Amino acid sequence: MKTALDPRHLNRQKAVQDLFAYSFKQQKLTTDLAKDVVKNLKSVDELVVKSAPEFPLERINPTDLSILRLAIYELVFDRSQPPKVVIDEAVELAKEFGGETSPSFINGALGKVLRYPERVIKVIADHLGAEEAKITPEADFKKDLNATDIEIADLLLLLEKDLSLSFPKDQKIVTVKDILDFVEDD
């Protein structure tokens, strides 16, 4: 568990504060992390809306929105930290800065984001070293993406760990859609 003095935690705290202030007045950002979130803000906000459809953006508490924006950026666009770390950190930030229901709201929304096709496709592209545009649902791993059996097996192991799920041993994975369907149905 990270301490309150952990530099990564402190950086996230500053980024949340930056994003909070930015939501009221688009001012100069002081952290690289917040700058990266804002560069991807349109896409991040689309995922925020999708993860909490019962709340329009303008109805989400600005503190919760700032935490969600940061965590969604880290989960979908940055992906340098394991998902569990990102979600745990976001929940901790919600406990520090948010209201009574903030931690459960943040945790629930981020749990949905983990399994979104947009994120799974980015993970597949990164793992296979393929262009994201080539990772369509119809793409055949071997024919279209030139993946070997070992690369496909490694990808499945990565996704199992990343998404806390288990692909059945008899599950035939031929296309990207096979993975997306399984993740959606699990």
Predicted feature descriptions by range:
Residues 154:
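Conserved alpha-helix in the HATPase_c
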